[in-house]
Amino acid sequence: MKIVVDGMGGDYSPHIVVKGCIEAIKEYNNIDIIITGPEKLINDELQKYEYNKEKITVLDAKDVITNNEHPVMAIRRKKESSIYKALQMMKNKEADAVISAGSTGAFLAGATLVVGRIKGVSRPALAPIMPGKNGPFMIIDCGANAECKPSNLVQFAKMGEIYFENILNVKNPTVGLINIGSEEEKGNELTKEAHKLLKDMDFNFVGNVEPRDIPTGNTNVLVCDGFVGNTVLKMYEGVASTIFETLKDEIMSSFRTKIGGLLLKPVFKKFKKDYDYKEYGGAAFLGVDGICIKAHGSSDDKAFKNAIKQAINFYENGIIDKIKSHIEQKMI
């Protein structure tokens, strides 16, 4: 399996990207990695490590797309950028998966324009796996489509169900619609119409899910438009960060609380690990005709290694072909 990684994507590129790739090839011997970016800069980073040099190659890309640029215009103009060249390899069947921690807008726009959608998919959707109290869950869409039709949400649900069932090995995962109330008649026109369609599909549909119930993880696949999904995602990350920081401040506030914190250290350590996004790698961009994983902008080497693991699972489980099969059978 060949995986192409955007070497200039993320807050700590290229050194963290390179480190994550090297850790991945040491753990997974069935992959080869191509890193896109300024050749000298990437090679200088690679020289800091001992590794099998046959497993990692560099594709020179002199340009970088930043978060401040207009995504579509940047993709169209900067064809020497690390993101564009990575996606072009996928388009040309020179790679089996693409991973980037760079500009989300540019990556999603590029995946849609360069790689292209699966025939029959109206809108690709971003689908991160999130940590929950009773197990991980997925939110789809998380920012690719701010405005949607009810039929889009039905496709999101099916693609999410296929991915969740195969990647997390959960048979017949539950599917819920994020809404302001659990009652069927609650919500706006989008959610009301989507609810009608979803309950008639072959999903394990559990109905509307209120935001307060999202963190439980009781519902496996949570469906919404990209505006709602991105808002929930960022709030979730912010709340988790605030809780950790507040606990840390309180524990360090006195000698007595420091002793208590020391006794509870194993509990806090497990809690932090369970709610660490690095454990889940990145968000799959479902609906494009190739494996595209969007890693978090602040990903460290562990997160990159796990994003690569995620791409391997995606490939080995044949998710793209399974989505295509459902579409051909007019099941979504």
From Swiss-Prot:
Pathway: Lipid metabolism; phospholipid metabolism. It catalyses: a fatty acyl-[ACP] + phosphate = an acyl phosphate + holo-[ACP]. The keyword Cytoplasm applies. GO terms for cellular component: cytoplasm. It is found in: Cytoplasm. Its EC number is 2.3.1.274. Belongs to the PlsX family. PANTHER family: FATTY ACID/PHOSPHOLIPID SYNTHESIS PROTEIN PLSX, PHOSPHATE ACYLTRANSFERASE. Homodimer. Probably interacts with PlsY. HAMAP family: PlsX. This is Phosphate acyltransferase.
